[in-house]
Amino acid sequence: MHAEALFRNLGAQMAGEGSVEGGKAMERKFLGEMGLNPDDFKVWDGCGLSPKNKVVPSVETQLLSKMARHPKGNYYINSFAGPGLGTGGKRQLDLPYPWLTRFKSGFIGEVHALVGYIFTMNG
């Protein structure tokens, strides 16, 4: 529900339309600016729960990579949880340095998923 409200607010603030369509318009614009094909992101709602949402996994990986190099990438990366933080509070990753991770967890229909970053000691 919060994600849906944020998506609509993004549309209102940036596209002048506080709706899912306004959010979609801004998302498409941003993806294009990032050099990605907006058609690879099929967004039906703002919360990500609709089975009509479709994202090409390799394009999601490209977006994560591009955001890591974006001038505001640190803000984006720091919005992800880590082990013991936020939604990552219950996650115990079997890594030598788990604090070098940032991730978003997901769970629906008995399926668990993680997406995010694992950093090396050199960045």
Residue ranges and their predicted role:
Residues 2, 39, 111-114, 123:
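Envelope-exposed proteins and targeting segments
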Residues 70-87:
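Active/binding-pocket-proximal capping segment
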Residues 6-10, 44-46, 79-80, 105-106, ...:
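Active-site-proximal beta-strand/loop segments in catalytic clefts of secreted hydrolases
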Residues 34, 67-70, 83, 118-122:
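Hydrophobic alpha-helical segments
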